[in-house]
Amino acid sequence: MLQPKRTKYRKQFKGRIKGVAKGGSDLAFGEFGLKAQEPNRVNAREIEAARRAITRYMKRAGRVWIRVFPDVPVTAKPTEVRMGKGKGSVEYWACKVKPGRMMFEIDGVSEEIAREALRLGSAKLSVKTRFVQRIAE
């Protein structure tokens, strides 16, 4: 699973996801892509599950690019522990995804295979997504 090798700080504030993606919203590598339609926190497990679903359907033909990286530590206190006594330990890593953010890109396969592979991948994610295709010039 994806996570940073090292960070400046161990824990982070929760924060809010406001506005739309100002960068990483266009196809940069592949011919087809999966674009987020709503804001949410996508954890590393979801990204990995989506990547597996996409590559499995493509039967390892073509290429997959993951355009998001889980860099936000999400903390949780153990069950049945009273409030207070400090912030909980880091449970998992997540990525704050804004609407318009390109999450996955694929290339080297037909449109039908790409569409179905990305549909299977999007089922693993906690954000609404849509299929996008590069416009031929």
From Swiss-Prot:
GO terms for molecular function: rRNA binding; structural constituent of ribosome; tRNA binding. Keywords: Ribonucleoprotein, Ribosomal protein, RNA-binding, rRNA-binding, tRNA-binding. It comes from the Bacteria. The keyword Ribosomal protein applies. Gene3D superfamilies: Ribosomal protein L10e/L16. Transmembrane segments: none annotated. The keyword tRNA processing does not apply. Belongs to the universal ribosomal protein uL16 family. HAMAP family: Ribosomal_uL16. PANTHER family: 50S/60S RIBOSOMAL PROTEIN L16, LARGE RIBOSOMAL SUBUNIT PROTEIN UL16M. This is Large ribosomal subunit protein uL16. It comes from Rhizobium etli (strain ATCC 51251 / DSM 11541 / JCM 21823 / NBRC 15573 / CFN 42).
